[in-house]
């Protein structure tokens, strides 16, 4: 029974990053297609996991006003959170906004 529990926990840990990658990929594809509702959902799910790519995606949506009302304060907030985790795209966009 312990071995089964160990295998289950190990499988959950090993699939979590790939699930986050899937959310980001799905969000990016939706964004590029103009399906901003789906992109917003995918990026929101990622931000709840403190994922820098999701935070960057949210910043971009608020920066451009795609799928949400344009809001530079919100864009800066999301870019800042992402930039603090080392996301170079967020760092660049944040610098451009200042």
Report each predicted region and the residues it spans.
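Positively charged n-region of N-terminal signal peptides that target proteins for export
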Residues: 1-4
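Bacterial N-terminal signal peptides
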Residues: 7-15
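Sec/Tat signal peptide C-region and signal peptidase I cleavage site
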Residues: 16-20
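Hydrophobic face of amphipathic alpha-helices that form TPR/SEL1-like repeat modules
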Residues: 23-30, 57-64, 93-98
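Short helix-capping/linker turns of helical repeat alpha-solenoids
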Residues: 31-35, 48-51, 64-66, 71, ...
């Amino acid at each position: 029974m312990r071995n089964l529990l160990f295998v289950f926990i190990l499988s959950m840990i090993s699939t979590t990053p790939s699930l986050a990658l899937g959310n980001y990929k799905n969000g990016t594809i939706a964004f590029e297609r103009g399906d901003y509702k789906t992109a917003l959902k995918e990026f929101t799910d990622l931000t709840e996991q403190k994922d820098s790519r999701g935070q960057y995606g949210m910043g971009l949506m608020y920066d451009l006003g795609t799928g949400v009302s344009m809001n530079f304060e919100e864009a800066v907030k999301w870019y800042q959170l992402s930039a603090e985790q080392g996301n170079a795209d967020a760092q660049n966009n944040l610098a451009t906004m200042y």
